[in-house]
Amino acid sequence: MTKLREDIRNVAIIAHVDHGKTTLVDELLKQSHTLDERKELQERAMDSNDLEKERGITILAKNTAVAYNGTRINIMDTPGHADFGGEVERIMKMVDGVVLVVDAYEGTMPQTRFVLKKALEQDLVPIVVVNKIDKPSARPEEVVDEVLELFIELGADDDQLEFPVVYASAINGTSSLSDDPADQEHTMAPIFDTIIDHIPAPVDNSDEPLQIQVSLLDYNDFVGRIGIGRVFRGTVKVGDQVTLSKLDGTTKNFRVTKLFGFFGLERREIQEAKAGDLIAISGMEDIFVGETITPTDAVEALPILHIDEPTLQMTFLVNNSPFAGREGKWVTSRKVEERLQAELQTDVSLRVDPTDSPDKWTVSGRGELHLSILIETMRREGYELQVSRPEVIIKEIDGVQCEPFERVQIDTPEEYQGSVIQSLSERKGEMLDMVATGNGQTRLVFLVPARGLIGYSTEFLSMTRGYGIMNHTFDQYLPVIPGEIGGRHRGALVSIDNGKATTYSIMSIEERGTIFVNPGTEVYEGMIIGENSRENDLTVNITKAKQMTNVRSATKDQTAVIKTPRILTLEESLEFLNDDEYMEVTPESIRLRKQILNKAEREKANKKKKSAAAE
């Protein structure tokens, strides 16, 4: 008879971005009294990174533990976005079941689908929590049917299809086993009880030889590299001599210097851990994800964890613009390279490859969001850098060149569906499904080449007047579609001079396109200051001041009225980029520029390119 550790449950929480997963975990922490009463719980307690709190997305997987009626429930928070899919797969290895959180109105979404597929493939036991049941537009019955359909589509087995459902409103701290909002009670007990009753307890084989697999990495200045993982069997104590089986097949011996267990949101030092525990372990500097820790006299590595390959790459380079070094703290190639290498310590879905120049690196990741978060994080830390336009990674599969395709789900008011369908068809998208969801809304599902989506979201938002919602996630690699897809249809307005932008110049340039800078902004030759309304690039002088001829004209300029400029965010700037442009990123500014700043040199290079293409 297999012994079980009935005092532990290991679960992962899965949800689409913004379906209330982090709020739900906060409520579980609060109601299990795991957090110290004196400490006021911050909202979104599990999102520790500023960017996560601002954007309402979870990037790094977090783990926390709550105690309920003598059982310890280890909860792994998963990123809801497929760009962070590398993390998702590894978390699934650490748990025995998943809690799927779905919005009672929105239902299942593409990212939910990605994460859920990974969970079902690992034979994990699912529980469904229908959240936001208090919404006036909630449609719990239909949503549960949608979840069931999704499970069937993803190949769930019969046991997985018998999932229990709990209805909740995490923000109000209520839950119930009934789908009637009137039956909600101010307690999370139904969720706790369902987890304990349905999620299997880990096997207790703590008397067998030790096996721990590292699923996540962390870094701490005091103890160095920390491996986070599950004890699959055996017992480990501080001071033990153990062996690390590396990914390349070699082994290294080390001594366990510290062990940490998870309590609430804290890590606390512990002296020993047994099979079924989730722990953090230190003592080995070059420990990596997927490696196995075993006793020195019984080395037996677990199968290596597969990590999703990157699908998108871009060039990162040292800032060499005329304004380089003005606003950032870290500007040299050595500092930028050190920072990228440090990111590799914890982000295993990222790749950084050197190029033929010491000032440039090819950085590959899982998608635009993955890379833009890295750029934004570096910018906040005081780095200056430039990046090129993102491009997809082409892979050879069975001798055929293949490119990544994404599954796109769009919710839009009916009147815009025609333009959305047309625009995605132009980007070589194939429509898989179209459903009227009521209230004049339509849901469209497409399969689109990933390069067709680079730069699409800005166009999509203006096309649907901001009412459309688009979600997309990597689907598969398919043979490359020949020809250009997507890209910008309009040229850039490029500054021909150095100086400050003036209201007088902006007034005369406005009719040529959309301006990106305010009067008084410093510009340099070759900097992009707007978007042309035509296809070609146009060089303009935005620094020209009005010639004053007499006293009366001096005040006349003050009445000049110009349109509010369109200030681009980091994501919009990335989307705007063309192949011959860079985005310059500093702690204070985001600027777009031509790779070749001088107009005459640019024209010479373009001529060369055209004649080479004609040959």
Explain the meaning of each model-derived region:
Residues M1-E615:
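Structural and coupling elements of P-loop NTPases
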